[in-house]
């Protein structure tokens, strides 16, 4: 993946391979930090959030976007989408996309069964991030969370 990115990007863009739980950057190296669809894919979300806070300067903003399981009225349409429509659409594209379509819904459900929203917000605060807020997007199927590094 990095080789393909290097081929497509300008030379001045520096790509760095690393692990979310142990980033190869100095303390406070970044003024701000964003991530997308990360916490479902790491073994220890708490460790990852502490590491993201470590590499962000004090006062810097940290923000993340994740998929979420909608509440209330939007839950049944979401379930239909991730259980049937997404895998079907994936199958129309390719076998690999069919696998992705079948993986996504269970992955999101299992993550929030292990890490309910309230607990995730606590992890952010425990990592040294203050003024933590979150907002549901896309009829509840997404959630953006942000705060400031203390």
Which stretches of residues belong to each language-model region?
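Class I SAM-dependent methyltransferase SAM/SAH-binding core
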Residues: 1-23
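Short catalytic micro-motifs in class I SAM-dependent methyltransferases
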Residues: 37-40
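A short acidic, Gly/Pro-enriched loop at the edge of an enzyme's catalytic core
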Residues: 21-33
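Core SAM-dependent methyltransferase catalytic element
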Residues: 126-150
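A short glycine-rich, Lys/Arg-flanked "PGG" loop and its adjoining helix->strand segment in the class I
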Residues: 46-61
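A conserved beta-strand element that flanks and buttresses the S-adenosyl-L-methionine
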Residues: 34, 63
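C-terminal alpha-helical "lid/dimerization" subdomain adjacent to the S-adenosyl-L-methionine
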Residues: 69-127, 133
């Amino acid at each position: 993946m990095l080789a393909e990115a290097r081929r497509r990007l300008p030379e001045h863009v520096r790509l760095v391979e690393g692990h979310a739980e142990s980033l190869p950057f100095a303390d406070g190296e970044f003024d701000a930090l964003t991530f997308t669809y990360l916490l479902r894919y790491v073994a220890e979300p708490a460790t990852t959030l502490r590491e993201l806070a470590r590499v962000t300067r004090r006062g810097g903003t940290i923000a993340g976007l994740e998929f979420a399981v909608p509440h209330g009225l939007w839950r049944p349409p979401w379930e239909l989408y991730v259980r049937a429509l997404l895998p079907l659409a994936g199958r129309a594209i390719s076998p690999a996309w069919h696998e992705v379509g079948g993986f996504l819904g269970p992955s999101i459900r299992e993550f929030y069964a292990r890490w309910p929203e309230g607990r995730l917000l606590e992890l952010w605060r425990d990592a040294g991030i203050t003024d933590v807020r979150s907002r549901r997007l896309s009829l509840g199927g997404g959630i953006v969370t942000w705060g400031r590094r203390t």
